[in-house]
UniProtKB/Swiss-Prot annotation:
GO cellular component: chloroplast
Primary location group: plastid
Gene it is expressed from: matK
Listed name of the protein: Maturase K
PANTHER family given in the database record: MATURASE K (PTHR34811:SF1)
Keyword Nucleotide-binding carried by entry: no
Taxon lineage: Eukaryota, Viridiplantae, Streptophyta, Embryophyta, Tracheophyta
GO molecular function: RNA binding
Keyword DNA repair: no
UniProt keyword annotations, A-Z: Chloroplast, mRNA processing, Plastid, RNA-binding, tRNA processing
Functional description taken from the UniProt entry: Usually encoded in the trnK tRNA gene intron. Probably assists in splicing its own and other chloroplast group II introns.
Length: 512
């Protein structure tokens, strides 16, 4: 227990850093403006509709002037009364504040990351860090097929913005900033016509700040959850008084007493000890998997529900968290359908007198491309009809031939790159066929020619354009397989960067 106080103790060296003065610095909003340019969109412009105009300091100065005025931060209890602080342009000012806050509130977290790199090597080894998202791929290849039970959990989002503020206040020790943050959050939330929309509304709405709030909430949840998971086998039969000292962990001790019945860590140790429990998170979902009986999975399920309910005031129904057997369940994971299948392997055993066959059953991971959702997305993007028959793109006939081909080839390569981890390529070949024929029909429509005549004129040149760069990469990685079509799985580490369109493939990949 000697090392536990060091872990639970808050970073005292930075709790007196004041962020409130930074809100009135024009340079902060200039940084936010530069970030907006990198995302091809920003709100700090003369016209909030025309995003091609130059950056304007006039709007920022006007906003800072209003924030300096004492009475303009008072929000009327009557929703119909106009807020004098935000005024008629409250949507624009809210977006500007959102971009500025996003830069400011990330400062304490950035300092923590930089300070961790300055520690000695032994301190870094002891620091509680989470694994990279790239560890998902070795988990799928090395661990997934050896597991028996799996639970696919949707991480609940905070239904009230005050929960996000309470989570943030443990790291930002500036009351003035938090008060202004609370005012801004409630006003920004009320600016939407339907305030009860899902948190993904903010994540997809070009709001870096709300993305940061959601990530900080998830980080706090995981830091608690994984700490108990990683330290469960090290708990000793000692008092749990030190364990309750961290306000970050126990905001509501009375409620958490109901979760952890008793005051001895032996109860927690026997409750959570499991060396075969695996936890993986991606986007707003997580996976719990175990090799043992479903009884332990059921215990972890109720622990998660109690943690969300009593610590984060988030209601989650235990009945909606299902525990599935991997052999009978297909997991929708990162744009793949993944399951574990039994493959029989027959071995002939020959002795001097007898010969007999040994049938061994082996578990094998199977990852397939979800063909129906992809065809549906292609249909909505007007590459094919609802049945998967390729159609032309009339909106592209004004472009040059090279631009049309380049766009279709880029989409095809992105799909091949992302779904290269599929163990069955047949569905992927069908998607490539749809894109290739849609490209040919678009070119034929532009030149007012038939598809057959256009293909005859081009010959194999168009087919060579659709050959992806995977062939070149495989020739370097697998020289022996370069002469034939390689059908194995290949996981590229950059595919999480394009997972915005996972589950809705008509996103950025079909609009590039």
């Amino acid at each position: 227990m000697e090392e536990f106080p060091g872990y639970f103790e808050l970073d005292r060296s930075r709790q007196h850093d004041f962020l409130y003065p930074l809100i009135f610095r024009e340079s902060i909003y200039a940084l936010a403006h530069d970030h907006g340019l990198n995302r091809n969109r920003s709100t700090l412009f003369e016209n909030e509709v025309d995003y091609d105009k130059k950056y304007s300091l006039i709007i920022v100065k006007r906003l800072i002037t209003r924030m300096y005025q004492r009475n303009h931060l008072i929000i009327s209890a009557n929703g119909s009364v106009q807020n004098p602080f935000l005024g008629h342009n409250k949507n624009l000012y809210s977006k500007i504040l959102s971009e500025g806050f996003a830069v400011i509130v990330e400062i304490p977290f950035s300092l923590r990351v930089l300070s961790s790199f300055e520690r000695k090597e032994k301190d870094i080894a002891k620091s509680p860090t989470l694994r990279s998202i790239h560890s998902i791929f070795p988990f799928l290849e090395d661990q997934f097929s050896h597991l028996d039970y799996l639970s696919h959990v949707l991480i609940p989002y905070p239904i009230h913005l005050e929960i996000a503020v309470q989570t943030l206040r443990y790291w930002v020790k500036d009351a003035s900033s938090l008060h202004l943050l609370r005012i801004f959050l409630h006003e920004y939330w009320n600016s939407f016509s339907t305030p009860k929309k899902h948190i993904t509304l903010f994540l997809k709405g070009n709001s870096r700040f709300f993305l940061f709030l959601y990530n900080s909430y998830v980080c706090e949840y995981e830091s608690i959850f994984l700490f108990i998971r990683n330290q469960s086998s090290h708990f000793q039969s000692t008092s749990s008084g030190v364990f309750f000292e961290r306000i970050l962990f126990y905001v509501k001790i009375d409620h958490l007493v109901e979760v952890f019945v008793g005051t001895d860590f032996l109860d927690i140790r026997s409750f959570f000890k499991d060396p075969n429990m695996h936890y993986v998170r991606y986007q707003g979902k997580s996976i719990l998997a175990s090799k043992d009986t479903p009884l332990l999975m059921n215990k972890w399920k109720y622990y998660l529900v109690n943690l969300w309910q009593y610590h984060f005031s988030v209601w989650s129904q235990p009945g909606r968290i299902n525990i599935n057997q991997l052999g009978k369940y297909s997991l929708d994971f990162l744009g793949y359908f993944s399951n574990v299948q039994l493959k029989s392997s027959v071995v002939r055993n020959q002795t001097l007198e007898n010969s007999f066959l040994i049938n061994n059953a082996m578990k094998k991971l199977e990852t397939t491309v979800p063909i129906l959702p992809l065809i549906g997305s292609l249909s909505r993007a007007k590459f094919c009809n609802a049945l998967g028959h390729p159609i032309s793109k009339p909106t592209r006939t004004d472009s040059s031939d090279s631009d049309i081909i380049d766009r279709f080839v880029r989409i095809c390569r992105n799909l091949s790159h992302y779904h290269s981890g599929s163990s069955k390529k047949k569905s992927l070949y069908r998607i490539k066929y749809i894109l290739r024929l849609s490209c040919v029909k678009t070119l034929a429509r532009k030149h007012k020619s038939s598809v057959r005549a256009f293909l005859k004129r081009l010959g194999s040149e168009l087919g060579d354009e659709f050959l992806t760069e995977e062939g070149v990469v495989l020739a370097v990685i697998f020289p022996k397989a370069s002469g034939r079509l390689y059908r194995g799985r290949i996981w590229y580490l950059d595919i999480p960067c394009i997972n915005d369109w996972v589950g809705d493939a008509e996103g950025s990949i079909f609009t590039k």
